[in-house]
C-alpha cells in the first residue's frame, strides 16, 4: 500500500486496523534449467561474468522486486528487471528459459521445484523451511538482511470498536 499510496482511495496506515495475520509465506530465489550450478553463489558468479545479459522477473514494486534489487546490488550483479503479474506468469517463463532467475513465493513454485523443473537457490525466510530443508536462507547464502515474506491478514476500518476487533482476532486465530 505504501508504494502505491497516491493511487489508493484510502490511506491504509490511517484508515485500517489490523485484526489478525492469516498466512506468512516465504519467497525463494529460483532459477530455470539454463542456469548452471545449484547454489546462489554459483548463480551470482555466472551472472557476474556476463553483466547485463540476463533478466529476472517480479511484479513491479512487490516484495519480490525490492528483494531482487537489494540482492543484485549486494552481489554486484547487473540484470534487467522484467515486470510480471506474479508467479503464474513467472514460473512458465523460468521453465521455458525466457528468464534466468526470479524471486517468487514458495507456495506457487514448490511443485516445479520438487519435480526438478526449476531450482531453489535460497529462501527469504529467517530459517530454512520444512518443505525445502536443503535450501539455505539468503542469510546463510551470504546476504543477511535481505528477504521478506508475503503475508495475508484481516483488516477492518480503523474506527471499528476494539471489542469487535478483539473478537474477530479471537475467531481468526481459532480458525487459522
Model-predicted segments: where are they?
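Basic phosphate/pyrophosphate-binding loop/patch that engages nucleotide-derived ligands
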Residues: 43-51, 110-119
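Conserved helix-loop-beta element of the AMP-binding
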Residues: 17, 43, 117-130, 147
